[in-house]
């Protein structure tokens, strides 16, 4: 377990900012408890400092996981968000998309979201923007990247792609073994 | 009509706006930077010097507006209707064309052509169009701000005009008041206004009142002497200047005549006018000199100087009284039979003009107004008749024109109408002139001696106060006439004056004009034509004030009555589909058909005039135009002056009319509002109004796509705490409306967001006046019903939430409301206001099962609660109730009844461990307090009285016995009796 290097933190926060914008600061400067990001075996964890201090007693090889996993760095040095960070993304998401109940399952099997399944969208969402997806009951079900802005969405036909799949809660079942 | 006349007609208006705009801007200087100020100064100076050189009709600011507009509304709908696009120009709405007519010199000729085409096509009657044109025209003249003092420049102007608008010659300007209209006397000779008046006056004064005449002369001479003394004996100064002017005008005349050959129609008329003008000036001279000579002859100067101040004052009063009397006489004479006695108006005019006393002037102006108000008929006087008047006597004599044979009665009526129109015209001319004179006097400038007003400029020096009050008087008359007879001829003049003075620096005058406009909007008997004119005029006024205007001015539009016939508006798009369709149809017509159609149309038009009713189609068109004009003004203010104080009322207006915005405009509107929300909005009221507009339009036109207006929620949430400030308390009605739109819809918003709004609203409710917080609490209750999940806020235990509640967060999504509870509601249960407890109890006892069975409609809405318990005017609402009667008291009363008012004894055994009940207190009071007992004749009192009486009787007897004993034993044992006596006294005292 170690803090991130400068390069790592740059790629990591760039990715995060794509989804939650300036609210990243709220993740780190919490009122209740100081939190921090730590890397353990290529995975980035969001962990309270107290827990982090305690876990320092455990040797690196023996430490399987701590706190909340936000994602992992690939071999090429890119960062990939994991679905486990969804709770935090959902809380601080800048742009949101609500999915109609009919398309929820499709999304949770790993498909992209079509216009037909678009229940609601935040006004002024630009294209290629990270968004968090919710069911109509405000349960977060994943995140993705928009292909069209809100304004363009108005005139789209129902079969057009609106949100590219990035991660969904179905992964908890599908990829249970590698999580 | 030729342009020379037009020129003349417009001249009186020229001076006003310049002074006015200057004045309007001055009080708002604080808002402008120094740089801007200097810029204005330079502009004004340039305007005064070189106006005549800027002879074409382009107004620079105007061009800028539209180029900016293009940039600004680059979204789809506006681009479609590009204003400068020739090809699409004709598709533009009619009014838009008119508005843009002069913006581009290249476009101008095209525009005029298209106007002409449209004129033929459009079904509205010509008058209206012309009035629009004139409106525009007036404005342009004003903006040009040319200087009338330079006569040479005038000529250049005229030439330029001729070159510039050959087309305009066709426009008939009968609705604009012509200056110095010739009056035809019974013998057919032409006389100017003053000629007639003076003749009449002389006659009248000789016949009627010798005394008043003397006084008048005295007054005049006194003032004249004073003036002469001041000027160092230069009585010849005025005549020379006047004669100079006359000469100038005479010089002008031949030049004008040359040009007149081009247009034969108007030549005679303008000739006569110019002559009249000369004659008129001479008349003034003559009058004054007559007065002078008379007074000199009478040699009353010496007497006059001897008069003390008090006597002078008395004389003045007497003069006023006399004037009043004669005013009343003349007015009642006219009103008793206007058709026969209309000539008596001249008397009123003469009183007004020939008296120097400002009070008399005011009286006469107002009485003239009242007279006109009463005698003006309920219809617009026929166009032909108006033409006849304008063309003077030539056509009236029937020179070559075959005239219809008319019956005697109709002839009589026509004659009357003609006269009425003439007098009315004169009245308006006087009003306009005197307004311009007053304005220039107030600005401490020498007024151009262009026209005669109600007073002579070279006469006495009026104080600023006098001038302002006179101005107020005049405007009162104008606005009254506008309100009562908006249908009548020359309303354009009234409209222009009124709307100009809505932004006048004097608050009283401005308010009066605003009130007039408001009531006009509310009861427009012309079906919207006048309102449209006013709206356009106000838009121009706002523009000339750089949109830095009082929010009250813009708020006036809220009074507009718009019916359901109106169609949805895209302010920068097409007026309607009709124009497009009509164009297609028309292509198939042959020439003969066209001709026939034309004839039909003119016939139809006459029929319509006769009907004097407004068809649905017409109304629709007018109201659409009105609304469009309003919207254009709104968006210009939002765009060009977002810091303007008027923004508040603009947003209010948008919120009110938002349901009338068409779907094409949705994108632009949201963009504008989004920009505003992001950085323009600083007050909670503005935020609420913007939100109302945005949510309403989205709800109406959002269609398939359901958008989440997050920014709007964030802005309102962050400004919500401002509501506790006392100055924002009035905003609660808007707030409820906006919040209902934002949160009221089922499942539109995330639960978390609703919860944070609930939390913040309940916090605010603690600080608001009771009726407001009651409304908020009831709104919270509604939210609990709509979003049952938010009831987690009411639970104190087992609530999962990560982190703490962040009360100061700006974003409702980040404040984590479920980490907190609604302790505010339980605090409010202890509120002194009696209505809190029941509502709160109901909220706090909610659970899911009850919720479904609950009938929401049964209860009063937040707004109703707010209204019904409003105690902002002090006092308690609901009033404080008397304490409830104790249940034992009721029991006792029942007992009393059952015993048929016989005596009862009630035994109470008070228990010490409890506090005394109110009943016991009352009983004890009744038995102990004798004063009250005596007043209240109740059962208890009677009983007590009896008891007392018996006690006293017993004691009395005892005393008697003791006294006897005492007297007996007195001599023997004096010591023994004393303690006994003392005892008895004690007993008596205690009883």
Swiss-Prot record, chain A:
One Pfam match: pre-PUA_NIP7
InterPro entries linked to this entry: NIP7_N, Nip7_N_euk, PUA, PUA-like_sf, PUA_sf, Ribosomal_synth_fac_NIP7, UPF0113_PUA
SUPFAM superfamilies the UniProt entry points to: Pre-PUA domain, PUA domain-like
Keywords (A to Z) from UniProt: Nucleus, Ribosome biogenesis, RNA-binding
Main location: nucleus
Subcellular location(s) of the protein: Nucleus, Nucleolus
Function comment: Required for proper 27S pre-rRNA processing and 60S ribosome subunit assembly.
Similarity field: Belongs to the NIP7 family.
Protein name, per record: 60S ribosome subunit biogenesis protein NIP7 homolog
Record organism: Dictyostelium discoideum
